[in-house]
């Protein structure tokens, strides 16, 4: 992913912050790293985010381990409340996946301004400057 990895993490963390921090920071970083560690070339941010958000609900349904210590990182999501934090995080990730698809459709239809509005609402202040 070359130099795209840190900005990508910042954008996904921006989404997380805008949603009330449903996923702990290191847990999120670990999922992003695991998702993209084998990518050999950089893609556009919009397509990269779309793929990640489409896969994020599945990652949230599975155990996640610290790559160094092998400690479980996602136990906080199962806090015994109803609905669990895991369910809430998955629902937020599914909505994000839907929004990224919608933004991509607007881009493909030549409606960049509408796509930008969706990205801004999704990523907050971490949406890259446009223009």
Predicted regions and their residues:
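Aromatic/basic-lined ligand-recognition segments
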Residues: 1
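Conserved nucleotidyltransferase catalytic core and NTase-mimicking acidic/glycine-rich helix/loop elements
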Residues: 4-130
């Amino acid at each position: 992913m070359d130099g795209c990895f840190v900005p990508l993490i910042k954008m996904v963390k921006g989404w997380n912050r805008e949603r009330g921090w449903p996923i702990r920071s290191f847990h999120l970083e670990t999922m992003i790293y695991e998702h993209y560690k084998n990518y050999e070339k950089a893609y556009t941010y919009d397509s990269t985010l779309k793929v990640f958000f489409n896969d994020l609900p599945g990652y949230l349904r599975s155990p996640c381990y610290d790559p160094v210590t092998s400690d479980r990182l996602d136990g906080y999501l199962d806090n015994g409340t109803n609905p669990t934090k895991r369910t809430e995080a998955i629902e937020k990730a599914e909505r994000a996946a839907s929004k990224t698809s919608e933004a991509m459709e607007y881009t493909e239809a030549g409606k960049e301004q509408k796509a930008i509005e969706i990205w801004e609402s999704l990523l907050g202040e971490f949406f890259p400057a446009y223009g």
